[in-house]
């Protein structure tokens, strides 16, 4: 911040748990934007003991054994980076034993315990750390961990003869095939994600859209407005204040899948999941995007992805809130003050951004971060999240030759294209090309939520206090997405890589959108008390 007073205001806000986005940032004339009460405020987030066990501490830091390296697919060595580690103790695995890959030591321990019907007790609190160096200290906790990661009691022979009950053969065969696919994919693709730097420089002189699009206004009049049933969504209501639709998440410790993703070093952060998932279909209800490619059962969805789905907002409720807000905006204006179509679109995008911020602040992992890190991540990716949200809406709901709005209305694409300026037309064209690519890939809801988290937890953001957590989330989500695509789309061997290659395209479109929005803002077409502009100023500061 440029002045002592601005810094003092910001520090005072932080003391009370609130930080204005864009406060003290310069406007187009170089003057600081005051920290008005109408700006979005972020609450001071205290780190919860969320359980990638209890070792995050006050700083929200990840435990040492989860300090993972940045996810890259350049020069990936299968032997080094995809080497299997025992899920019980972290030692090198020797093969499939009693339901999953384990080391020789844990195999023998599990077999002796079951065959001899041993009963152990723990002299501590039944949460002893089990690793290669101290796996023999507490047999009780070691055996419990064997069971929790999926070793099967029924696979041990009761007659003490060598060799287990080989009823898991098909599962082992499938798991081996999956690993070979991973190895081939990683070696073949050699992906390196780089953000595209091409941004169209030409700015349009003006934007006028045909009155045919004005059906947005008339359609909104037909929707019954029930303010009692809808929480307020205006600028005086911060999306960082708990609302009736805020999501609640169980502690990490209760999530079975995290034992695979979050408890071991980076080379073990892979979702092999030899046994079926326990999550029920009801655990992913509440999200209305029903994609055409929904063929996978919960048994083939990594547990981490199921938890990401739980963070998703209720789309009909978001749609109703935005429509109610637009109704109220129009009702409060006289005939001569009615919003232009462009102004209406800006309000629509602005309210969509509010819902995205609400989603982020209630999401798993993100809420573990301190306020400063949350602000930096959101300021970095807000436009990408908006574009991704729009793109996915078109993939799922859009019809050929039309644009599907967040309010649930279809607008003729050709009308917008014929009336828009050069830059907006180009931007829309690129967006439609991306929609077509994702449709051809059969882009689905599970992949959508993974990409959202990959965009939000960007490794490009500098000066993060808890970069290790961001890095860990990137690797976990990448691993879950890889497993999901391999398991559910085996015929599309390159799908994982193709999805990742869409991220630079989303970044390029978002950069174009930011430039266009800033141009319209300089022309006075977008008001200051707008979250889009506050975010834009914060990113450019």
UniProtKB/Swiss-Prot annotation:
Residues 83-154 bind DNA. One of its GO terms (cellular component) is RNA polymerase II transcription regulator complex. Abundantly expressed in pancreas, less in liver, very low levels in heart and lung. Expressed in the Hep-G2 cell line. Isoform 1 and isoform 2 seem to be present in fetal and adult liver and Hep-G2 cells. Gene3D superfamilies: Erythroid Transcription Factor GATA-1, subunit A, Retinoid X Receptor. Residues 528-539 are annotated as: AF-2. A motif (FTZ-F1 box) lies at residues 168-187. It holds the Pfam family zf-C4. Sumoylated by SUMO1 at Lys-270 during the hepatic acute phase response, leading to promote interaction with GPS2 and prevent N-Cor corepressor complex dissociation. This is Nuclear receptor subfamily 5 group A member 2. Changing residue 148 to R: Increased ability to activate transcription of target genes. It comes from Homo sapiens (Human). GO terms for biological process: acinar cell differentiation; bile acid metabolic process; calcineurin-mediated signaling; cartilage development; cellular response to leukemia inhibitory factor; cholesterol homeostasis; chromatin remodeling; embryo development ending in birth or egg hatching. A zinc finger (NR C4-type) spans 86-106, 122-146. Orphan nuclear receptor that binds DNA as a monomer to the 5'-TCAAGGCCA-3' sequence and controls expression of target genes: regulates key biological processes, such as early embryonic development, cholesterol and bile acid synthesis pathways, as well as liver and pancreas morphogenesis. Ligand-binding causes conformational change which causes recruitment of coactivators, promoting target gene activation. (Microbial infection) Plays a crucial role for hepatitis B virus gene transcription and DNA replication. Mechanistically, synergistically cooperates with HNF1A to up-regulate the activity of one of the critical cis-elements in the hepatitis B virus genome enhancer II (ENII). Activated by synthetic agonists RR-RJW100, SR-RJW100, endo sulfamide compound 6N and GSK8470. There is a cross-link at residue 270 (Glycyl lysine isopeptide (Lys-Gly) (interchain with G-Cter in SUMO1)). The C-terminal extension (CTE) loop competes with a DNA minor groove anchor of the nucleosome and releases entry-exit site DNA, thereby promoting opening of closed chromatin. Belongs to the nuclear hormone receptor family. NR5 subfamily. Changing residue 270 to R: Impaired ability to act as an anti-inflammatory role during the hepatic acute phase response. Changing residue 162 to A: Slightly reduced DNA- and nucleosome-binding. CDD domains: NR_DBD_Lrh-1_like (cd07167), NR_LBD_Lrh-1 (cd07069).
């Amino acid at each position: 911040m440029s002045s002592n007073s601005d810094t003092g205001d910001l520090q005072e806000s932080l003391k009370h748990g609130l930080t204005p986005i864009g406060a003290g940032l310069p406007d187009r004339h170089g003057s600081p934007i005051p920290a008005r009460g109408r700006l979005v405020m972020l609450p001071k987030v205290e780190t919860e003991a969320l359980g990638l066990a209890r070792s995050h501490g006050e700083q929200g830091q990840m435990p040492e054994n989860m300090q993972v390296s940045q996810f890259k697919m350049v020069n990936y060595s299968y032997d080094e980076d995809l080497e299997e580690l025992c899920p019980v103790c972290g030692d090198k695995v020797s093969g499939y034993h009693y339901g999953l890959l384990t080391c020789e030591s844990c195999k023998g321990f599990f077999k002796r315990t079951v065959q001899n019907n041993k009963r152990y007790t723990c002299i501590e609190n039944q949460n002893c750390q089990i690793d290669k160096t101290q796996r023999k200290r507490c047999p009780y906790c070691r055996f419990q961990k064997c069971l929790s990661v999926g070793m099967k009691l029924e696979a041990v022979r009761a007659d003490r003869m060598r060799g287990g009950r080989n009823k898991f053969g098909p599962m082992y065969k499938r798991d081996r095939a999956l690993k070979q696919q991973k190895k081939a994919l990683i070696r073949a693709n050699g992906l390196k994600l780089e953000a595209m730097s091409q941004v169209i420089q030409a700015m349009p002189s003006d934007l006028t859209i045909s009155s045919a699009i004005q059906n947005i206004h008339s359609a909104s009049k037909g929707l019954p407005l029930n303010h009692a049933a809808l929480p307020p969504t205006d600028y005086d209501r911060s999306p960082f204040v708990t609302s009736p639709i805020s999501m609640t998440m169980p502690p990490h410790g209760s999530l079975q899948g995290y034992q695979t993703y979050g408890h071991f070093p980076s080379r073990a952060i892979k979702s092999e999941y030899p046994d079926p998932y326990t999550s029920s279909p009801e655990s992913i209800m509440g999200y209305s995007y029903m994609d055409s490619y929904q063929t996978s059962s919960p048994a083939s969805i990594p547990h981490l992805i199921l938890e990401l789905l739980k963070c998703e907002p209720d789309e009909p409720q978001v749609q109703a809130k935005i429509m109610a807000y637009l109704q109220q905006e129009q009702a409060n204006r006289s005939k001569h003050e009615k919003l232009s179509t462009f102004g209406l679109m800006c309000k629509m995008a602005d309210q969509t951004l509010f819902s995205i911020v609400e989603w982020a602040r209630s999401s798993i992992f993100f809420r573990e971060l301190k306020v400063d890190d949350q602000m930096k991540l959101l300021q970095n990716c807000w436009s990408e999240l908006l574009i991704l949200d729009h793109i996915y809406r078109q993939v799922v709901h859009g019809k050929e030759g039309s644009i599907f709005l967040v309010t649930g209305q279809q607008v003729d694409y050709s009308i917008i294209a014929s009336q828009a300026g050069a830059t907006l037309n180009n931007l829309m064209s690129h967006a439609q090309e991306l929609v077509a690519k994702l449709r051809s890939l059969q882009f689905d809801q599970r992949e959508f939520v993974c990409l959202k988290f990959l965009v939000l937890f960007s490794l490009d953001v500098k000066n993060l206090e808890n970069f290790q957590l961001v890095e860990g989330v990137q690797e976990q989500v990448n691993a879950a997405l890889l497993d999901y695509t391999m398991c559910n789309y085996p015929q599309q061997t390159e799908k994982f890589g193709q999805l990742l290659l869409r991220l630079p395209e989303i970044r390029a479109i978002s950069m174009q959108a930011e430039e266009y929005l800033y141009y319209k803002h300089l022309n006075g077409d977008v008001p200051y008390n707008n979250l889009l502009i506050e975010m834009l100023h914060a990113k450019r500061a």
